Design a protein with these regions (language model features):
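Gram-negative outer-membrane beta-barrel transporters
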Residues: 1-111, 115-123
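Hydrophobic, lipid-facing positions within transmembrane beta-strands of outer-membrane proteins
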Residues: 32-36, 96-102, 197-203, 274-280
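Outer-membrane beta-barrel translocator domains and adjoining extracellular loop/strand segments
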Residues: 61-67, 125-131, 230-235
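Extracytoplasmic gating/loop element in the C-terminal half of outer-membrane beta-barrel translocons
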Residues: 111-211, 242-265
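Acidic helix/loop microenvironments that form the catalytic cleft of cell-wall polysaccharide enzymes
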Residues: 118, 220-225
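C-terminal beta-signal and terminal closure region of outer-membrane beta-barrel proteins
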Residues: 229-284
Length: 284
């Protein structure tokens, strides 16, 4: 209608049947991973461990279920949510994962250890806030990215997209994703998040009490970088980005009228802020 609200009931093949379920096995996933890890022990109880994973995961649906209407809630689509013919990067995709753990040799009963873990290359999509394809779901439609350099692009859309591209707070990955999508529907999970990680530190001191009895005092600091600077140790990972919301529908031109979200690609930062944990253990 004029407000851009699609009547999903008009998409039915027949009005004679209320609901029909056809069970099919069309889900596909291609996953490749390379893992390298190792451990080096030195000077009595010193240790350094390292693990790196390179991963590539593509599928035609990341939803592990069997009801089409439920699957569309998380499956970003171009048009028909039942069309699983195209493989693209999975919701579960990541490119790099690194875990490093090290502990210094114990001196005078004092032990110090640190752990770094990070992940990069997770994915997200550019979508429309609204039920574009009339499938009953208003949060699963991939957005058509208008080319601001195309003279046929309406001025308000040209200005809106350029505002996003010129916004210094927008993640570079979003700008790249938008530019690669000019003049076409954005690819599912075509946005690539950067690499982010956290560093944890542990310091412990053991006091000998009597014979085999001892008392250990420990301090754990989680996300040390965030303790030093509130802007460090925070992730900039993005989820699905609603670049447009439906404002209305032009009956003459047969096209939607959108509001452009100027904050598309602006990360609210994520992760866990720094934390302290103090422990006391008595062993006998």
């Amino acid at each position: 209608d004029a407000n851009g609200v699609a009547d999903w009931k008009q998409g039915r093949k027949t009005t004679e049947v209320g609901r029909v379920l056809e069970m099919v096995s069309e889900g596909k996933v291609n996953q490749f991973a390379f893992v390298i890890d190792g451990t080096w022990r030195y000077f009595k109880d010193g240790e350094l461990s390292f693990s790196y994973t390179w991963n590539d995961t593509k599928d035609n649906t990341s939803y592990n279920g069997n009801v089409a209407n439920s699957a569309t809630l998380s499956q970003m689509v171009v048009d028909d949510p039942r069309d699983l013919s195209k493989m693209s990067y999975s919701n579960n995709q990541f490119r790099h994962k690194v875990v490093v753990y090290g502990s210094a040799p114990t001196f005078w009963g004092i032990s110090v250890g640190a752990r770094f873990s990070g992940i990069g290359g997770t994915r997200y999509s550019l979508i429309v806030g609204g039920n574009v394809n009339g499938d009953f779901v208003d949060s699963n439609d991939l957005a058509y990215i208008y080319d601001p350099n195309d003279p046929k692009t309406p001025e308000y859309l040209r200005n809106g997209i350029n505002d996003i591209l010129n916004n210094p707070d927008v993640e570079e990955s979003t700008k790249d994703y938008i530019r690669k999508s000019f003049g076409k529907v954005a690819e599912r999970n075509g946005g690539v998040n950067g690499f982010y990680g956290t560093l944890d530190l542990r310091i412990a001191k053991k006091f000998k009490i009597y014979k085999q009895q001892n008392l250990e005092l420990s301090v754990d600091i989680f996300n040390v970088a965030n303790l030093l600077n509130k802007n460090w140790g925070a992730g900039h990972n993005l989820g699905a980005q609603k670049i447009y919301s439906i404002k209305g529908f032009d009956q003459d031109k047969k096209e939607y009228i959108y509001n452009v979200n100027a904050n598309t690609g602006v990360s609210s930062l994520n992760g866990t802020p720094y934390q302290f944990q103090i422990g006391l253990r008595y062993a006998f």
